[in-house]
């Protein structure tokens, strides 16, 4: 099955009878009643949301889609918590399959379709995209890395991608911030070098009652050394590796690729670089100076500063990382902080990039081989992709709930005078509730950077986050570092990664805590290296190198076959 675009017998018949249009015009189903009487509805399975209090079929966007396209899907919702189990049972038995899997759970579509790629369950879609989906094809042509990320190891694509561009928001950690009020009180400038930053921390340590609560309880810096980090935002260690000569990478959204970077085109395990040791020595100095919060080493995330210190009614922390400024719930405390500029160190600058992508799922809206109307589904996705206003509302929630038109006619989230959410309804009174109850979300929507301020306003609760990231040096960091693309892997590669990567990651985490508290010796550095080797670090690098090379070859192959097709040349460059 080569991703052929042969129409099914049912599609040919419905086309002959004038029930459907496959030329890109709307509606796609021209006579809904006659179509459904003859063929029934196209069935779609999605994941339920705890926030959704109505049937997905009754959401505003689903009704809008039917109004525009004539397609009324028959929706089945399965509980999110047991979704992976249920979907695997469906796929193993091959029984009870829907025509379309809307989603498999956040970030899970790629591995799922690869795992079942040789079972003839999912329809390859690369040719359908090229021949029937001009809107999606253009986006993939304009962004070769996205085509690379949706191509399975066998060269096929399955389903269609979910892309949420937000000006690179998830491609670097959340902001590193410092208490400007305390700096002012101590007559200090915002630091621009690592040395100046250390001097600021020492001043916070010795500054007495900086927050005015009558106690000497200012904490100079609060990192958190546990796992479950959000986009590498809380563990300050990795931010400083670049200052010592080799930036590391750490990101919960793609954890198998933690500590990997492309350096001169080669996959490199950066936590073995000498810079990592120097960073550990530096953090041990900070610890010995009494600058690091003593709660930073708890294993349980409910004990992290983000769940405790950051929520108090007075500022407690001099410098910390956050994923979003909204984590600081007290407005007065919030307004004391500013972002730290990228700091110059002895052998480079601070900051790191995440091995992540704004293409969050490669294979949503996955069409099964039993679907009688695959081209109708494909044209539906291209309708959703091709109309930016539909794409934005399908992703984040409907107009009249999460969006109103501002004075320029652009979709904007309604906010009160304090900048808090003021949309939705009495029952759906948060952005999340109004989203869940007006769209199924997380299918194959595509939101592009170019839509901001032309179609919709930038997501209201991420405005400060992005500004602060830019102060941290986001643009330069993204230009300087080559990250590991989120490529799809063979099932046996994933199995091996699942065996070795958690041990590798735990080893790094364990040694960091030991080094920060006890210092680094030649012996401990040597035992760290040998433990990582025994855990399979060379295999890890090799698997990623193979996957990255294969994806590049697949991309070159598809590019050369396209150019060959366009010049009708007979030579092949595969």
Predicted regions and their residues:
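Short acidic loop-to-helix transition motifs that present clustered carboxylates
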Residues: 80-84, 300-303, 346-347
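Glycine-rich, aromatic-lined ligand/substrate-binding cores of catalytic
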Residues: 279-280, 284-291, 304-325, 333-336, ...
């Amino acid at each position: 099955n080569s991703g052929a675009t042969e129409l099914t017998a049912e599609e040919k018949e419905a086309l002959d009878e004038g029930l459907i249009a496959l030329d890109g015009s709307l509606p796609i189903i021209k006579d809904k009643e006659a179509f459904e009487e003859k063929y029934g509805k196209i069935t779609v399975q999605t994941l339920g949301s705890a926030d959704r209090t109505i049937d997905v079929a009754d959401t505003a966007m689903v009704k809008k889609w039917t109004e525009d396209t004539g397609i009324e899907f028959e929706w089945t919702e399965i509980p999110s918590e047991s979704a992976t189990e249920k979907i695997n049972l469906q796929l193993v038995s091959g029984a009870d399959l829907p025509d379309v899997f809307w989603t498999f759970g956040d970030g899970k579509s790629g591995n799922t379709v690869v795992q079942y790629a040789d079972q003839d369950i999912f329809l390859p879609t690369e040719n359908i995209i090229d021949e029937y989906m001009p809107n999606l094809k253009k986006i993939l042509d304009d962004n070769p890395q996205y085509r690379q990320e949706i191509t399975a190891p066998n060269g096929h694509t399955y389903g269609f991608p979910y892309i949420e561009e937000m000006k690179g928001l998830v491609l670097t950690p959340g902001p590193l911030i410092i208490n400007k009020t305390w700096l002012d009180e101590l007559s200090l400038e915002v630091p621009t070098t690592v040395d100046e930053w250390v001097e600021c921390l020492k001043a916070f340590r010795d500054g007495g009652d900086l927050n005015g609560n009558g106690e000497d309880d200012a904490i100079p810096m609060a990192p958190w050394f546990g796992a479950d980090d959000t986009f590498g935002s809380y563990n300050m260690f990795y931010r400083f590796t670049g200052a010592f000569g080799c930036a590391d990478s750490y990101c919960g959204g793609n954890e198998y690729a933690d500590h990997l970077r492309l350096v001169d085109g080669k996959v490199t395990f950066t936590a073995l670089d000498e810079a990592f040791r120097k960073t550990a020595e530096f953090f041990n100095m900070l610890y010995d100076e009494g600058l690091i919060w003593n709660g930073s080493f708890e294993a349980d995330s409910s004990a992290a500063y983000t769940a405790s210190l950051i929520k108090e009614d007075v500022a407690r922390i001099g410098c910390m990382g956050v994923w979003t400024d909204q984590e600081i719930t007290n407005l007065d405390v919030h307004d004391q902080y500013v972002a730290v500029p990228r700091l110059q160190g002895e052998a480079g600058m601070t900051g790191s990039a995440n091995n992540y992508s704004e293409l969050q799922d490669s294979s949503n809206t996955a069409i099964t081989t039993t679907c009688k109307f695959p081209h109708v589904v494909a044209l539906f996705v291209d309708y959703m992709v091709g109309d930016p206003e539909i794409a934005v509302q399908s992703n984040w929630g409907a107009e009249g709930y999460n969006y109103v038109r501002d004075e320029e006619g652009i979709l904007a989230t309604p906010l009160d005078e304090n900048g808090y959410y003021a949309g939705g309804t009495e029952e759906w009174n948060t952005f999340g509730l109004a989203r869940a109850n007006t769209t199924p979300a997380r299918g194959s929507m595509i939101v592009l950077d170019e839509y901001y301020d032309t179609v919709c306003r930038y997501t209201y609760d991420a405005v400060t986050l992005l500004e602060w990231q830019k102060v941290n040096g986001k643009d330069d960091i993204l230009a300087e570092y080559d990250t590991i693309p989120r490529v799809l892997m063979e099932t046996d590669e994933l199995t091996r990664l699942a065996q070795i990567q958690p041990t590798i990651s735990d080893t790094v985490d364990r040694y960091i805590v030991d080094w920060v508290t006890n210092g680094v010796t030649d012996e401990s550095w040597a035992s760290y290296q040998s433990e990582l080797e025994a855990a399979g670090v060379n295999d890890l690098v090799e698997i990623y190198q193979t996957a990255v090379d294969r994806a590049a070859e697949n991309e070159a192959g598809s590019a050369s076959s396209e150019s060959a097709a366009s010049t009708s040349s007979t030579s092949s460059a595969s």
